Amino acid sequence: MAKRCLIMAGGTGGHVFPGLAVANALRAEGWDIHWLGTAERMEAQVVPKHDIPIHFIPVKGLRGKGISARIQGAVALVKSLFSARRIIKRLQPDIVVGFGGYASGPGGVAAKSLGIPVIVHEQNAAAGMTNKLLSKLASRVLLGFDDAKEQFSGAADNVHTVGNPVRDDIWQVKPKKRESYAGATSLNMLVVGGSLGAQILNETVPETCGVLNGLSIKHQCGKGNSDGVVKAYESVGADMANVELSDFIDNMAAAYEWADFIVCRAGALTVSEVAASGRAAIFVPLPFAVDDHQTKNAQSLVKQNAALMIAQSVLKQNLGQAVRRWLEHPEDCLKMGALAKTCASIHATENVVSHVKSVVGEGD
């Protein structure tokens, strides 16, 4: 009889896509996969496209909200715990693996109360509150970045750095060749602001880079933002033949393949994909991210000289200068991308799968 794994992940691609990578790898080995999430978040649309049964619980976030919202969230949390317990009792999975998101907390607690082993995967260099709590009852705590290890000191014996699972097509992105940079007079810049777009990138990139000679730009600006971004480029006299705008990029692997370097936020999945693609990057961490986790994610590459980081507060002053430097010395861009590739966790997905099988085999 096939082993069964319940994946818990939701809210953002940073949680969902690593979960999908592991789900698909386990399914390829004959496992039966189910998913626990929330009906209002992106997992409700994305997961069914992969033919994975998804089960919903009525949970909401609590952190950083007003007293009324917190009370409502607490009530929903209690309901979601009982809902998760009913679902898990019915499914009887051999193991539950949480990748973060609202469903992971109640799902992990419910699984443990039923004697089902729990694995937690933390993508960020600064661990989230839910995973910190779940680590106390988890059989294993798996980390995307080694810098997060000190935050799980209470579960030190069960903490393992495995990297962040990345989709196979990202790993297939071909490295840039040194000879293509000999005497290069142009570079391709990919600007990625996430599914909603990043307002600071939409405003600053056109102003600071729109008229740089030798720069071709693909700019993902988020749904509903393209008209304003076009005007921003046109207002500085940019040649729109060298600028391509999109609300959303469906094929990120092709976008990375085209790019010489990327300007982007520093979510855990983005940082991991940049490294896997072997591209140089200028990270602009979201300054209001919980526990400043995006800065810590970016630093995992920056401290290896494998990426640049510019604080949002000084982006306007420094972005154009950084891009001009690469246009003048494109070989530096190539070298940084190659260094980024050496920081990538190429075996992350199989590492997680190995831990899943190990825990089930041990009967923890």
Swiss-Prot record:
GO terms for cellular component: plasma membrane. Pathway: Cell wall biogenesis; peptidoglycan biosynthesis. InterPro entries: GlcNAc_MurG, Glyco_trans_28_C, GlycoTrans_28_N. The keyword Transferase applies. One of its GO terms (molecular function) is undecaprenyldiphospho-muramoylpentapeptide beta-N-acetylglucosaminyltransferase activity. It catalyses: di-trans,octa-cis-undecaprenyl diphospho-N-acetyl-alpha-D-muramoyl-L-alanyl-D-glutamyl-meso-2,6-diaminopimeloyl-D-alanyl-D-alanine + UDP-N-acetyl-alpha-D-glucosamine = di-trans,octa-cis-undecaprenyl diphospho-[N-acetyl-alpha-D-glucosaminyl-(1->4)]-N-acetyl-alpha-D-muramoyl-L-alanyl-D-glutamyl-meso-2,6-diaminopimeloyl-D-alanyl-D-alanine + UDP + H(+). Its EC number is 2.4.1.227. Its main location: membrane. Coiled coil: none annotated. GO terms for biological process: carbohydrate metabolic process; cell division; cell wall organization; lipid glycosylation; peptidoglycan biosynthetic process; regulation of cell shape. It holds the Pfam family Glyco_transf_28. It is a peripheral membrane protein. It is found in: Cell inner membrane. Keywords: Cell cycle, Cell division, Cell inner membrane, Cell membrane, Cell shape, Cell wall biogenesis/degradation, Glycosyltransferase, Membrane, Peptidoglycan synthesis, Transferase. UDP-N-acetyl-alpha-D-glucosamine binds at T12, G13, G14, N124, R167, S195, I249, A268, L269, T270, V271, S272, E273, Q294. The keyword Transmembrane helix does not apply. Cell wall formation. Catalyzes the transfer of a GlcNAc subunit on undecaprenyl-pyrophosphoryl-MurNAc-pentapeptide (lipid intermediate I) to form undecaprenyl-pyrophosphoryl-MurNAc-(pentapeptide)GlcNAc (lipid intermediate II). Belongs to the glycosyltransferase 28 family. MurG subfamily. This is UDP-N-acetylglucosamine--N-acetylmuramyl-(pentapeptide) pyrophosphoryl-undecaprenol N-acetylglucosamine transferase. The gene is murG.
